[in-house]
Amino acid sequence: MTLYNEEDILLQLKSADPNLQKKAFEQIVSFYSEKLYRQIRKMVLSHDDANDLLQNTLIKAWMNIDLFRGDAKLSTWLYKIAVNESITFLNKQRAQNNISIDDNDTFLIDKLESDEYFDGDALQMKLQKAILTLPEKQKLVFNMRYYDEMPYEEISEILGTSVGALKASYHHAAKKIEEFLNHD
């Protein structure tokens, strides 16, 4: 098993050798696919949609790898692409199904309940339903902080929001989830 070294991989991506570039990107795919899939899946819920969006994310990353400046970590850049792809997908889905923002919670909860790949118990289902009632930004912040254990600084880079605003968003999300779990 080869160890993942981001500095070496970035050097290989910048090389003139297409085989070296391809090998480096294959390592990126191998290292980040599962993490990106989980982030996307938390946003779109559907296994099939998450797989499609993961592929779109990786294709977009490959096609634009020369635009990666190295200001942030590669993972941050990939997460940003994945989040943007997911938000675009959700907005298109909402428009295609003629779903208002207010009705979106019900739509997503119905989707979660009918998901054949969901293997959690009743408490996990209740937690997921609570998360689905959050506004999109709070949902993103909560998932990245709680499930992915990302530092606020990295979330800030991905979402383009200040650390203070993210902390407030996470706090509000946690309170809303707590209220949902205690009253439902």
Give the positions of each predicted feature:
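Short, charged helix-capping/linker segments at alpha-helix termini
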Residues: 18-27, 37-56, 163, 183-184
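Structural recognition of an alpha-helix C-terminal capping motif at a helix-to-coil junction
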Residues: 52-59, 72-84
